[in-house]
């Protein structure tokens, strides 16, 4: 028996775009985590495709929510050990901020947004969420922000496909949202067990309502404004 393909029909007023970790450390050459993902970006066109999704969502008037990852100096006081990727992020380090109440040192840092995305992210309408602290949205306000907007359908993408992107997918599903994933607007790294991008795609197909290319996602988003 084949795996069902539920599909997802986007609807104006009920649909949003959610992007995770849209930050220099993962998405810009020279970022502390760039080398982990660079090969997958080259294969997928990930950085360009994330830009295309942003542009399409803005043109269609779709709400855009960015789920950033920030670490503050006080986070170094954590005692409980993190898992493998959490430990790696601390070693690199990535997404460092001087504190939650200051922007000192943020501009151009690894925690900042890539310059090419700022016209869309910093337009006064994009929702920049409180930071997720490990992988998923249980530590930020994504679910609240979606519910307050009566959003029920979400298109999700971001650089760390089998880590933060998948964690957000799982959180959204557990709370009743319909979710479409964008297969070539993700990245990933590999370890001795296999390739992270392929692991993400396998699980996206098992879990999500739909798995689209960027071309498909952009076309479906554009249809909302017609």
State what each model feature region is.
Residues 13, 31-57, 61-68:
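A short alpha/beta connector and helix-capping loop motif
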Residues 1-16, 25-26, 43, 52-60, ...:
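Active-site-adjacent betaalpha module
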Residues 72-76:
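Short catalytic/ligand-binding loop motif for oxyanion handling, primarily in non-cytosolic enzymes
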Residues 20-21:
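N-terminal nucleotide-binding beta1-loop-alpha1 segment
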Residues 67-70, 159:
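Short, well-ordered beta-to-alpha junction loops that form the rim of enzyme active sites
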């Amino acid at each position: 028996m084949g795996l069902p393909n539920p599909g997802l029909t986007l609807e104006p007023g009920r649909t949003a775009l959610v992007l995770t970790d849209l930050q220099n450390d993962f998405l810009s050459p020279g970022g502390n985590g760039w080398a982990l993902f660079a090969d997958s970006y080259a294969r997928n066109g990930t950085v360009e495709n994330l830009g295309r999704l942003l542009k399409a969502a803005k043109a269609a008037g779709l709400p855009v929510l960015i789920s950033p990852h920030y670490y503050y100096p006080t986070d170094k006081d954590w005692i409980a050990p993190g898992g493998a990727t959490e430990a790696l992020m601390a070693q690199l380090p990535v997404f460092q901020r001087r504190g939650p109440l200051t922007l000192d040192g943020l501009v151009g840092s690894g925690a900042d947004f890539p310059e090419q995305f700022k016209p869309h992210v910093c337009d006064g309408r994009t929702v920049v969420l409180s930071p997720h602290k490990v992988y998923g949205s249980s530590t930020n306000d994504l679910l609240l922000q979606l519910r307050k907007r009566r959003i029920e359908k979400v298109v999700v993408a971001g650089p760390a496909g089998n880590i933060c992107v998948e964690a957000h997918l799982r959180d959204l599903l557990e709370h009743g949202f319909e979710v479409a994933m964008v297969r070539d607007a993700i990245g990933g790294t590999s370890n001795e067990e296999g390739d992270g991008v392929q692991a993400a795609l396998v699980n996206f197909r098992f879990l999500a309502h739909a798995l689209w290319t960027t071309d498909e996602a952009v076309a479906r988003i554009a249809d909302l404004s017609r």
